[in-house]
């Protein structure tokens, strides 16, 4: 089968399309014939050796896949050949087939296409865990989403609206804000034109946002924290800006607020049943049209480098998908 391989830490253009042996389903596993693999920003960091998870070489990028069950190993009873499924794989999704533990695979309905299905797991899984499990939101509270037109940010906008929150999209262009407003945001703040701290105070009539969802980091994090409401919750999702901010902890004291880390991957590993229930709920909501799982663009497997460069250049609004 064909696979995109990273054999040493490198840039996207250094990845190689190669032939590798087909996987075999061991006991408790199933082999998925991959129809769509979703890329995330951390895939770039992973191939560069800058991510906290460092798979052994050679490995493939792409941590979430959708496809069809091709074979099952001994002891697997809840999956059968031909089932349409999604799964989170951590890495190795940029290939034609993959063997995974059967208990990590979730079925999808016929009315949910593979491209949209592949993009559900990580961004919506992260956003749902962040908002539902870490933020403990109350209906009517204000949610400010940084990087609101990116994958995780867009998921937070949609889920925030479903939870009855007042969503403020924060992004670097008016085009991105309009996109976020079409996906659940009520208000928008262009932080390329207006100071983020002052803008959030203005849009909340001086109170500040109750929940701040930050997948961006960099200089925006402190500005957002300075605008947070009393007893607000600041959710640390990631650092797409590249810089990990150093936050003055006196702000947490003065605001009576919480700074809460969100590491969906580790939480999912430690809470597999709750994570599975979350994914099944997200699949149902997407199939029902309550969530968009918007796909920005697709690429054939051989053009994985081009797909990663779209993410690196902040050009995607929604998911970037590979077709093996």
Tell where the protein language model's regions lie, with residue ranges.
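N-terminal Rossmann-fold NAD(P) dinucleotide-binding loop
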Residues: 153-154
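Residues located in well-ordered beta-strands
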Residues: 2, 16, 21, 33, ...
């Amino acid at each position: 089968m064909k696979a995109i391989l990273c054999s040493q830490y490198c840039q996207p253009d250094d990845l190689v399309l190669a032939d590798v042996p087909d996987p075999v389903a061991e006991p408790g596993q199933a082999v998925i014939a991959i129809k769509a693999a979703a890329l995330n920003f951390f895939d770039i960091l992973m191939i560069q050796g800058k991510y906290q998870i460092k798979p052994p070489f050679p490995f493939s990028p792409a941590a979430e896949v959708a496809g069809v069950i091709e074979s099952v190993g001994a002891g697997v009873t809840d999956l059968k050949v031909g089932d349409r499924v999604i799964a989170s794989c951590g890495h190795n999704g940029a290939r034609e087939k993959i063997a995974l533990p059967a208990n990590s695979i979730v079925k999808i309905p016929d009315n949910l296409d593979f491209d949209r299905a592949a993009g559900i797991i990580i961004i919506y899984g992260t956003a749902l865990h962040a908002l539902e499990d870490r933020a403990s939101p109350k209906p009517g509270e204000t949610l400010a989403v940084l990087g609101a037109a990116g994958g995780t940010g867009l998921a937070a906008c949609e889920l925030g609206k479903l939870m009855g929150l007042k969503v403020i999209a924060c992004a670097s262009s008016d085009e991105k804000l309009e996109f976020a407003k079409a996906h659940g945001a009520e208000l928008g703040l262009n932080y390329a034109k207006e100071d983020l701290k002052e803008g959030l105070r203005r849009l909340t009539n001086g109170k500040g946002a109750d929940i701040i969802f930050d997948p961006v980091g960099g200089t925006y994090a402190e500005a957002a924290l300075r605008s947070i409401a009393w007893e607000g919750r600041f959710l640390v999702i990631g650092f797409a800006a590249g810089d990990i901010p150093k936050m003055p902890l006196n702000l947490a004291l003065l605001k009576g607020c919480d700074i809460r880390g969100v590491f969906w991957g580790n939480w999912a590993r430690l809470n597999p049943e709750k994570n599975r229930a979350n994914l099944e709920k997200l699949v149902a909501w997407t199939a029902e049209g309550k969530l968009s799982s918007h796909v920005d663009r697709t690429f054939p497997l051989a053009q994985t480098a081009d797909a990663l460069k779209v993410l690196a250049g902040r050009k995607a609004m929604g998911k970037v998908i590979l077709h093996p």
